[in-house]
């Protein structure tokens, strides 16, 4: 059957296969941790190099890091507001950097050259566990932000501007993490799949524009994730009058 | 599970959720703390210190500028008052010199008139003296003529 041959072709791309690590009776997706450790290690090395010798007159890497810091601050400040953005800036920035480094790392580094016994290395954000973990952290954060800033008055948000909104606002608490995680997961996985299929079918030239598109999508997804996370936190701490 | 079967994986699949999720969450939280102490705090300190430095300098410069403007305005009013003072002094001096000139002119006129009058009087007196003398001489002459005429007869 045609469908069957198609499926075996897809299987050659090793979609949905994982490198399992068994610790006690918990199972982990090893390839996700391997790539995330490599990428985060590179990120931390980069940042340590840039902040090693901080000067009032920035040079080289420090310039880049200050630009990045400023970018993240603007993002957090516009979404969360002047009052509490400072508390949340590291979290928003970490989300942005983690997603960005994961997406670009997954797209730029030829992981396929490293053979694993099962599954293959790729962007950590192409694994549903990672994106759900990030999305749930965002949910916890905005609940915590709302409750710590406004106490029980946080729940006024659910009946604002009218109590009719209550079911929708409750539903939102579920759709927010769902949409956050699936948007990121879907975009990055789709990008990897498209590039993988194209490379599989036409190994020359044709995948290159799609790869560039992938880089673009990756950066945009990181920005979207961080912006939405900041927006949700900002929504939770916003004062209604 | 459609996804599991569609992609032909014997175990796992695309939507295989397991302990990777909480561990990844813990890893991201840890990363937040690491990045906070390694990146956000130090870079923030430097950037905010510089921003404070720049804004302080701007405020200082603004203060100095306003001070300069105040001094400039002060000087301008001083200049203005000095100018009016000078004008006043000049016009006063002009008035005074005008007055002096007029006085001198009047004095000179008076003097000239007086001397003219005196001269006129003198001329008049001399004229009348001369006329008296002339008429006396005419009298003498006529007397002489008369005498002679009388004597010849």
Curated annotation (Swiss-Prot), chain A:
- What is the scientific name of the source organism? Prochlorococcus marinus (strain MIT 9215)
Q: Which InterPro entries match?
A: ATP_syn_F0_a_bact/chloroplast, ATP_synth_F0_asu, ATP_synth_F0_asu_AS, F0_ATP_A_sf
Under PROSITE patterns, the record lists: ATPASE_A
Residue span of the signal peptide, if any?
A: none
Per UniProt, subcellular location reads as:
Cellular thylakoid membrane
Q: Output the Gene3D superfamilies linked to this UniProt entry.
A: ATP synthase, F0 complex, subunit A
Q: Which classification does the entry list for the species?
A: Bacteria, Bacillati, Cyanobacteriota, Cyanophyceae, Synechococcales
Any idea which UniProt keywords this protein has? ATP synthesis, CF(0), Hydrogen ion transport, Ion transport, Membrane, Thylakoid, Transmembrane, Transmembrane helix, Transport
Protein's job? Key component of the proton channel; it plays a direct role in the translocation of protons across the membrane.
* Database matches in SUPFAM superfamilies: F1F0 ATP synthase subunit A (SSF81336)
**Know the name of this protein?**
ATP synthase subunit a
């Amino acid at each position: 059957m045609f469908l069957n041959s198609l499926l075996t072709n897809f299987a050659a791309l090793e979609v949905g296969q994982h490198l399992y690590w068994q610790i006690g009776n918990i199972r982990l997706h090893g390839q996700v941790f391997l790539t995330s450790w490599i990428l985060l290690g590179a990120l931390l090395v980069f940042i340590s190099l840039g902040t090693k010798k901080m000067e009032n007159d920035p040079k080289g890497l420090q310039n880049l890091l200050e630009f990045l810091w400023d970018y993240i601050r603007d993002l957090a400040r516009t979404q969360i507001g002047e009052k509490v953005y400072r508390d949340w800036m590291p979290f928003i920035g970490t989300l942005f950097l983690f997603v960005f480094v994961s997406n670009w790392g997954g797209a730029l580094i030829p992981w396929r050259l490293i053979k694993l016994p099962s599954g293959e290395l790729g962007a950590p954000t192409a694994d549903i566990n990672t994106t759900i973990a990030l999305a749930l952290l965002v949910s916890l954060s905005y609940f915590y932000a709302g409750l710590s800033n406004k106490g029980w008055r946080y729940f006024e948000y659910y009946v604002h501007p009218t109590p009719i909104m209550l079911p929708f606002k409750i539903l939102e608490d579920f759709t927010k993490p769902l949409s956050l995680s699936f948007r990121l997961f879907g975009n990055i996985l789709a990008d990897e799949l498209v590039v993988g299929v194209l490379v599989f079918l036409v190994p020359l030239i044709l995948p290159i524009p799609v790869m560039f598109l992938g880089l673009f999508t990756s950066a945009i997804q990181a920005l979207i994730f961080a912006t939405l996370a900041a927006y949700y936190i900002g929504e939770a701490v916003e004062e209604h009058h | 599970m459609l996804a599991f079967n569609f992609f032909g994986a014997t175990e796992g699949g695309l939507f295989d959720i397991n302990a990777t999720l909480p561990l990844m969450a813990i890893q991201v939280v840890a990363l937040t703390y690491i990045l906070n102490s390694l990146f956000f705090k130090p870079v923030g300190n430097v950037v905010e210190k510089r921003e404070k430095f720049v804004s302080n300098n701007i405020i200082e410069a603004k203060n100095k500028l306003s001070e300069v403007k105040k001094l400039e305005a002060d000087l301008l009013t001083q200049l203005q008052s000095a100018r009016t003072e000078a004008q006043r002094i000049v016009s006063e001096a002009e008035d005074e010199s005008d007055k002096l000139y007029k006085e001198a002119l009047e004095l000179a006129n008076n003097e000239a008139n007086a001397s003219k009058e005196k001269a006129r009087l003198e001329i008049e007196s001399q004229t009348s003296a001369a006329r008296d003398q002339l008429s006396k001489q005419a009298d003498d002459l006529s007397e002489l003529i008369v005498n002679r005429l009388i004597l010849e007869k």
